């Protein structure tokens, strides 16, 4: 950008994150972004350099593993303690590489309704969750070994 909002800069850098649950959709969106940028440049007598840094693959749970994980949680803490959100959350997570190799489920242990979001500068981990998380992971291990 420029030195002030009303000064046209010599150079502009635009960044962003592109996420989807489908590789083909992601590639199509990237192609459309490139076409739009190149089209805007062609009518404004400027050039564009598009740099794509591949990120993590989509984090997609195995349905059987997700069901197993939720059943263990329900049995440990009750059905009202569980939010079975089924729509994608677009989580960018290195665990996605593990899910490409072995079936599994990425789970979230909520911090409570009054918590700041995880990546907020004001986030404060709720230490009272430690025993709940430990009990859950122990229950998962016990059930998988049965």
Report each predicted region and the residues it spans.
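Metal-dependent amide/peptide-bond hydrolase catalytic core
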Residues: 1-146
């Amino acid at each position: 950008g420029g030195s002030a909002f009303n000064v046209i800069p010599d150079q502009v850098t635009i960044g962003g994150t592109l996420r989807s649950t489908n590789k083909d959709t992601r590639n199509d969106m990237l192609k459309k972004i490139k076409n739009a940028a190149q089209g805007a440049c062609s009518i404004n007598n400027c050039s564009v350099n598009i740099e794509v840094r591949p990120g993590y693959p989509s984090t997609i749970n195995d349905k059987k593993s997700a069901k197993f994980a939720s059943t263990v949680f329900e049995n440990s803490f009750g059905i009202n303690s569980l939010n079975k959100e089924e729509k994608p959350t677009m989580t960018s997570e290195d665990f996605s590489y593990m899910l490409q190799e072995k079936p599994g489920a990425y789970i979230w242990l909520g911090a409570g309704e009054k918590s700041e979001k995880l990546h907020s500068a004001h986030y404060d981990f709720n230490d009272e969750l430690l025993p709940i998380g430990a009990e859950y992971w122990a229950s998962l291990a016990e059930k998988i070994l049965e």
